[in-house]
Amino acid sequence: MSTEQDAVLGLAKDLEGINLLTVPNLERGHQSKLCKEKTTSDSSSSRKPSQQRDNYRKRRPKLICIPYTSFLHTGMHNFLTKPPRDIFHESKEVALFTNGRAYTILRKDLIPNLKESIAELYESSLLEAKKRKVPYLGHDLFANIDEFVPMTISELDSVSPCFSYIENWILDNPGKDFKIGKKFTVVTTRHHIVDLTMHLFNRRNRQTSLIVTYMGAGLLSFCRNVKKDSQMSKEGIYSNDPNMKKICYSGFEFENWVTENSKVADLTGSKCPIFSLVESKLSEEIGLLIRCEMDAFNPVSETNTELKCFAPLSMHNSNHRRKLLKTWVQTGLLPNSDIMIGLRDSHSGQLLDIQWYSRDLLCKKFNHPGLPTNKKELNYNAQIAVEWCHYCIEAICKLVEANISDYSSTKPESFEIGIDTNNAIVITKLKTTPRNVELFGM
């Protein structure tokens, strides 16, 4: 057997270990058009044997595709009695970041705090909750839209707070490399992890794509792929459609309505976004530093509160179940989080109700055996979402490791990672690093 065949077999065996979770009713991902484990090789028979040995690392077969059939997951009908607590088995907040400065996580006064009566909803009886909510109901959630200035797309995707934190850590630990995982540390904004996870639960997704850049010492960054999501600047809060813009703005107005003003403002007096930096471990080999935007802090329960604004929800509506799964995933990436949902009238924009959920209660709302089964989107099973999230990150790290020039190199190398319509994860090496990618130490 040739050396190259040995290498391919070795990679295939490695893949068998991806996400082999000891969970009940394991199922294998089905792929209509099978993407076999693909490798490429730049070997040449014209090279001398000595050159071939010396350049083995350069010419070894490179893994470029991991098929969906490698994904083993819980049965879609198997809703766990107790939902997973967090997305990763180990997560902790390590710093707050706002207006260009880092702060200790104890500075909760920097985060918009829930107003007192809203903060107390988490422990209120139905009658008490109704009384506390009354003064807030009926508010026009489309008000003040003309004054609102959203974050730019580049600000939305920036990991500069993470890099600032790493730089400070290195100053305090001279001569050491910053590592959360022994092999890889992924630096990313939270929405990239959410998007990777939710790809599996939206059959309308054609492709999920992002740029992954290796910067040496095991440091990876996830970044927006500008070429593949150019429509982002025309969607959501950035849309030219006034109705779509109103719907998206209502969430920001709801935040302003139920929170006290933050103490942090920019030079114009506008409220600055505040981020929590979270260190998480997927395994001993892979860690993450995640930038999570914060909506509010509950000073009564001392929890981070995610604020959402939706039209009235029906769990018989697939879109609504998907929204709640996405919210559950999002809050699972920021430790000690709960959820407050404002329900609005779709036409008038009036606030109809305010509902508090723990992550467990929210999960039980959309993961219930009495709900219609949606096989195409894996029944929005929360446990499968966790397994798929882990699988994606492990697969990306494995693909990058197989395609970088040298693990110890400090020269940035960028790759396009795509999840296609068949849920295969594919890597393409880029000749240059895209301009929108932020680089550590530069």
Swiss-Prot record:
Cofactor: a divalent metal cation
Catalytic activity: a 5'-end NAD(+)-phospho-ribonucleoside in mRNA + H2O = a 5'-end phospho-ribonucleoside in mRNA + NAD(+) + H(+); a 5'-end (N(7)-methyl 5'-triphosphoguanosine)-ribonucleoside-ribonucleotide in mRNA + H2O = a (N(7)-methyl 5'-triphosphoguanosine)-nucleoside + a 5'-end phospho-ribonucleoside in mRNA + H(+)
Biased composition (Basic and acidic residues): 31-40
The EC number(s) this enzyme carries: 3.6.1.-, 3.1.13.-
Positions of the UniProt region annotated as Disordered: 31-56
Molecular functions (GO terms): 5'-3' RNA exonuclease activity; metal ion binding; mRNA 5'-diphosphatase activity; nucleotide binding; RNA binding
Keywords tagged on the record: Cytoplasm, Exonuclease, Hydrolase, Metal-binding, Nuclease, Nucleotide-binding, RNA-binding
Binding residue positions for a divalent metal cation: 255, 295, 306-307
Entry keyword Cytoplasm: yes
Comp. bias regions, Low complexity: 41-53
Main subcellular localisation: cytoplasm
Keyword field contains GTP-binding: no
InterPro entries (UniProt xref): RAI1 (IPR013961), RAI1-like_fam (IPR039039)
Compartments (UniProt record): Cytoplasm
Additional free-text comment from the UniProt record: Present with 1040 molecules/cell in log phase SD medium.
Protein function: Decapping enzyme for NAD-capped RNAs: specifically hydrolyzes the nicotinamide adenine dinucleotide (NAD) cap from a subset of RNAs by removing the entire NAD moiety from the 5'-end of an NAD-capped RNA. The NAD-cap is present at the 5'-end of some RNAs and snoRNAs. In contrast to the canonical 5'-end N7 methylguanosine (m7G) cap, the NAD cap promotes mRNA decay. Also acts as a non-canonical decapping enzyme that removes the entire cap structure of m7G capped or incompletely capped RNAs.
Family (UniProt): Belongs to the DXO/Dom3Z family.
Name of the protein in its database record: Decapping and exoribonuclease protein 1
Originating species: Saccharomyces cerevisiae (strain ATCC 204508 / S288c)
UniProt lineage: Eukaryota, Fungi, Dikarya, Ascomycota, Saccharomycotina
